[in-house]
Regions:
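Interfacial juxtamembrane loops and adjacent helix segments
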Residues: 1-66
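Intrinsically disordered or compositionally simple regulatory linkers and C-terminal tails
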Residues: 218-230
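Internal, charge-rich low-complexity segments
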Residues: 82-134, 151, 206-221
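Polyanion-binding and phosphate-handling cores
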Residues: 48-93, 165, 169, 181, ...
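Membrane helix-loop boundary segments at the extracytoplasmic
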Residues: 61-68, 100-133, 169-196
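Internal/C-terminal transmembrane anchor helices
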Residues: 233-239
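Hydrophobic transmembrane alpha-helices and their immediate junctions
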Residues: 70-107, 137-166
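Hydrophobic cores of alpha-helical transmembrane segments in multi-pass inner/ER membrane proteins
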Residues: 133-146, 195-217
Length: 239
């Protein structure tokens, strides 16, 4: 809505006025102080007139760029996209070099195109953050659709176990939904903890740490080995 556009406009003006802060930003949770001189006065007509500034812009990529700079934005995007990349690998969708390289290309090109197109059209950064989020989301959807259309049906040897695939797919959907949400919303502490906790669960399932099928034989083997000496004693002849 108009409130978000005005906030993004103020952040765009702040970034344009201080190019020396682009590498590292104004500092985590310091957006309120840096944004105050660039507050758009028209925002008071549609928002609380007592509000003099905002500490969040309702767009996580733009927040990251303003508070942690280009380096922080790249690090955050890399962390999120690595989760998407490995989820695709664990689902068996990127099991060879060609598919992995194509997925990397999509995930790199998506945010770049998403940032450059609004910058070229609007001549400012106010929609660049939204474009980055849309670019990542569309890149992931396009790659998954492309693989679904061109990939042959998996053989029994290549098929991922159904229970593991279901859990990873569900967790990937939750993580992607949260990523979409923070393009126009504010990531509060609860949602951030949820995101990284579920990311940890997905990694554990993906690498097999939570695979009950692999742990069961090890548990059942111990009683069998312990029972062997007892069976020998029962079969021994008395002296």
């Amino acid at each position: 809505n108009q409130v978000r556009i005005y906030v993004w406009e103020g952040l765009s003006d702040m970034l344009a006025a201080h190019p020396e802060r682009w590498p590292l930003g104004v500092g985590p949770d310091a957006l309120y102080l840096g944004y105050y001189p660039y507050f758009v006065p028209a925002l008071r007509q549609i928002d609380n007139p007592l509000v003099g500034a905002h500490d969040r812009s309702h767009n996580e990529p733009l927040d990251r760029l303003a508070t942690t700079g280009v380096l922080g934005l790249i690090a955050w995007l890399a962390a999120v996209e690595v989760l998407f990349f490995y989820a695709a690998r664990w689902l068996g969708l990127a099991d060879d070099r060609a598919r992995r390289n194509s997925l990397i290309a999509f995930l790199v090109a998506g945010p770049l195109v998403g940032a450059l197109v609004p910058l070229a059209v609007d001549r400012s950064l106010r929609f660049a953050g939204l474009g980055i989020g849309i670019g990542v989301t569309l890149a992931l959807i396009a790659w998954l659709a492309w693989q679904g259309l061109r990939r042959p049906a998996p053989t029994a040897a290549d098929r991922v176990p159904a229970d593991r695939a279901a859990v990873i797919t569900a967790l990937l959907g939750v993580l992607a939904a949260h990523f979409v949400e923070i393009q126009v919303g504010i990531p509060v502490t609860a949602t951030q903890v949820m995101f990284w906790a579920l990311a940890g669960v997905m990694v554990s399932v993906g690498v097999g740490r939570l695979d009950a099928d692999e742990a069961a034989p090890a548990v059942e083997a111990a009683p069998t080995q312990a029972a062997a000496p007892a069976s020998k004693e029962r079969g021994a002849k008395p002296l």
